[in-house]
From Swiss-Prot:
Cofactor remark from the record: Binds 1 zinc ion.
Organism: Bartonella bacilliformis (strain ATCC 35685 / KC583 / Herrer 020/F12,63)
Family: Belongs to the endoribonuclease YbeY family.
Lineage: Bacteria, Pseudomonadati, Pseudomonadota, Alphaproteobacteria, Hyphomicrobiales
Keywords, comma-separated and alphabetical: Cytoplasm, Endonuclease, Hydrolase, Metal-binding, Nuclease, Ribosome biogenesis, rRNA processing, Zinc
Protein's recorded name: Endoribonuclease YbeY
EC number: 3.1.-.-
Biological process per Gene Ontology, one example term: rRNA processing
Subcellular location: Cytoplasm
Amino acid sequence: MISINMTIENAEWGDEKILYTITEKALIATIDRLSLTQVTSELSLLFTNNMRMAQINTQWRNKNKPTNVLSFPAFPLKAGQNPGPMLGDIVLARETIVYEAEEEGKSFHDHLTHMIVHGILHLLGYDHETDDEAYQMEELEKEILQKIAIKNPYTELL
């Protein structure tokens, strides 16, 4: 079992129980798909705003701007490896996720779930630096999200 620790820095995120439920659903679907249900680990999430995300992005990636999600693995993993006792940290920026959801015609909760799945996959060693890696990661995301009744996030709006 992977335990979830959450820090909510911004009241605009709303109800902590709803955020926990979304996170738990994303985590369970991801670990089920990757056959990691027997793993014991810990996941931390920071729900913050664009200003704080820009600070973190500058500090760790030298990019002075907010982004939707950042992942910080506790231990470097290759895709398919079992995680250690601490999976890592995921940071989410509310304003960016709200903006993207509106621009892409998605519900906020569906897009947030996608960003959490995306972050978890990064912590588990998946990446999108090459076309092959991006394809593999996107396919996993689509499969995981489909299991929890969320449409393909990569479908273009017409």
